[in-house]
Amino acid sequence: MGGCFSKPKPVELKIEVVLPEKERGKEELSASGKGSPRAYQGNGTARHFHTEERLSTPHPYPSPQDCVEAAVCHVKDLENGQMREVELGWGKVLLVKDNGEFHALGHKCPHYGAPLVKGVLSRGRVRCPWHGACFNISTGDLEDFPGLDSLHKFQVKIEKEKVYVRASKQALQLQRRTKVMAKCISPSAGYSSSTNVLIVGAGAAGLVCAETLRQEGFSDRIVLCTLDRHLPYDRPKLSKSLDTQPEQLALRPKEFFRAYGIEVLTEAQVVTVDVRTKKVVFKDGFKLEYSKLLLAPGSSPKTLSCKGKEVENVFTIRTPEDANRVVRLARGRNVVVVGAGFLGMEVAAYLTEKAHSVSVVELEETPFRRFLGERVGRALMKMFENNRVKFYMQTEVSELRGQEGKLKEVVLKSSKVVRADVCVVGIGAVPATGFLRQSGIGLDSRGFIPVNKMMQTNVPGVFAAGDAVTFPLAWRNNRKVNIPHWQMAHAQGRVAAQNMLAQEAEMSTVPYLWTAMFGKSLRYAGYGEGFDDVIIQGDLEELKFVAFYTKGDEVIAVASMNYDPIVSKVAEVLASGRAIRKREVELFVLHSKTGDMSWLTGKGS
């Protein structure tokens, strides 16, 4: 493992450095008269990209034969605040009527393909019903996360009381749009030991920071470094779909980074940061100067410290290779999952159809108790038991026993011995900030990096985002919190980038997360730590419910299964700054207005 541009180490050094395709100019042409952008390989030498490797850019104004136009409805067919999916021959379009105006957009969320017509329309944007991403209905732009791409916006005209939509056939089929981005024009890119922006960590926060800089017109050098051997990938899928291959998880193809001049250093470990000289040092000794620094190192999974911890086939899930190996070894074997949090339960659910047996060991009385409460936790536990998962609650692992070096049994403190060929440990994580201890960058007692609303650390020019930070949560009276959610990391990465450019942006996102188990999705919005009551509407046994988490007189979080789009609705209300009172929820449940959420907007029913 090593840093960037270092001397060759044939076995250990693996670097993925992707450089920009420079603007064509006379001084940049090769002897053949063709532009010759270069990329550094693992040994520090340069190679030329061939013409066929270049990205093709579609013409921004499609010819008439590439477009389709049709009348999709009468002007009176939609009321203000309504949405409808309409067919346009080559694909569907989301038609929206808001404040008397019609808007036509892509109909699927670019994140995971949710039908936006089932989402929430509010304040000039539509919020995805599945994961909470928000899109501006006037532009199609992504305004809140998760996800990277925006929606296509189509032309609308009114003639003789009919609504016509015109769209390119290609846009109808793609259903996603990458924002216009700058390219790197820095003459030193790839040749210098300095960079304008260095991003440590290539998860959601790091990638969104880099993309936001380019979207805002930043054309200087950006270096993104990661401990992973892969380009940025969809990490939440690791525990939900363990046999997904790395190339299927990629958030952007290699050509994307090349096109927009975002250099990616893989398997590059930062060991020290010197804020006085603005230099970072990599494990192989290479030093890189920066002007602005984003720290997004993420977290490291906790491991077991019991007797026998060195036996083989005991895993944490941190990389695609970890996940792939677990599912390969688990087929037809006995699996023990330690920890009944989101990661552990997702892994257990996924392996039930592949393993001979799946057992879960947990210190609490019920899964998710601290996060979702006793009643919801028990309902989910029953769902797992109905799918042949065995639980060992209120105990922990005291010993891992092996045979010929490989795991054979898990011994619990309750004295129970559980057969196990594979053990997956999901007992939480700690911030991966050890390399910052002597840097002068502030860390709290748990190792998290405290930041302000603008994602700034205590050191000027140094920002932090993602799982390793604590930040003030605006709608919870700026309470300092750590929220290791995929969606939150996206938002923090964008705010950090905006403030690198002195835009004075602040974090205002409402946390939104989701999990999937046995084909059922649970959605959650808000920040429920410290809740003192849970109000449930629906049927827990049927797993069709919404749970409101309250503290005092205020709703601070909501969770649901088979009750869409109520979580997105609540998230939108909280994002607007309006508090939801406990009494409102109690009346909602009392009158059993199942599915009716008009009370949230104050419109009545």
From Swiss-Prot:
Region of interest (Disordered), residue spans: 22-45
Keywords: 2Fe-2S, Apoptosis, Electron transport, FAD, Flavoprotein, Iron, Iron-sulfur, Metal-binding, Mitochondrion, Oxidoreductase, Transport
Matches recorded under CDD domains: Rieske_AIFL_N
GO BP term, example: execution phase of apoptosis
Compartment(s): Mitochondrion
Residues annotated for [2Fe-2S] cluster binding in this entry: C109, H111, C128, H131
Assigned GO CC terms: cytoplasm; cytosol; endoplasmic reticulum; mitochondrial inner membrane; mitochondrion
Signal peptide, first to last residue: none
Gene Ontology MF term list: 2 iron, 2 sulfur cluster binding; metal ion binding; oxidoreductase activity, acting on NAD(P)H
Residues where FAD binds: G201, A202, G203, A204, A205, R235, K240, V270, D467, W514
Coiled-coil intervals, chain numbering: none
Described function: Induces apoptosis through a caspase dependent pathway. Reduces mitochondrial membrane potential.
Free-text comment about domains: The Rieske domain induces apoptosis.
Name of the protein this chain belongs to: Apoptosis-inducing factor 3
Gene from which the chain derives: AIFM3
